[in-house]
Amino acid sequence: MSRTNFDTLLEAGCHFGHLKRKWNPSMAPYIFMERNGIHIIDLNKTVAKVDEAADALKQIAKSGKKVLFVATKKQAKQVVAEKAASVNMPYVIERWPGGMLTNFPTIRKAVKKMATIDKLTNDGTYSNLSKREVLQISRQRAKLEKNLGSIADLTRLPSALFVIDVLKENIAVREANRLGIPVFAIVDTNSDPSNVDFVIPANDDATKSVEVILDACCGAIAEGLEERKAEKVDMEAAGENAPKGAGKKKNTKARMDKAEEEAINAAKAAAFLKEDEEA
């Protein structure tokens, strides 16, 4: 069963593309028709592509990996922040920090700096500083929070990137391509889909359009997280139900095997020395 449907996408305005003169020929397979100089996206293909992307995102979440959402355009920022946060995924809605992926260690240092400032604030270290110094540090902390606060929990490179508007976020897409990180994206008729692994052809300028697609994709991520949680509970239960002493017996057997191997090796060494003496 599909995670979305034609009518839902139609009502959200997902079918509206850009003016014909602004189109990217690579998007031709996803265009249904032209009306009043505007390209209309084939929503049947959008439904199929949403399902394809959602299934892949579910597996990524189920494996315990992170998906980084990227949307710095005004129409998408708020909805992306809400949807990504709802499934505990990192997101970037302010200016994309150049080198965020290709120079990830430097970004992590900035995040750690933010944590250090918090620690020094809590332990009273700043009580010995002047008001001016405290103000400077506070401003620095606020700037770091604005740009990097939403990725504070991203301790390693994400396993995928989900982008709203690949034309605007071309630097992020380029960095992901360079590192071999899969790119999921809502791609409008004016954009190039060639650098995107999972293309979702749809209107990327309307908040409602972005929202309905994120509902389906984040719903799949939530399912993956739930399945991972259930599997973990089952594994823990299986461990508790294992016969008492099973682990101990296994360790004892391992020690016995090792002792036996050492005894055999010692016997071989003794035999070798004896042969050497007789010679």
Model features per residue range: what roles?
Residues M1-R3, E226-A279:
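Intrinsically disordered, compositionally biased charged tails
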Residues M1-V233:
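Ribosome large-subunit tunnel/peptidyl-transferase-proximal elements
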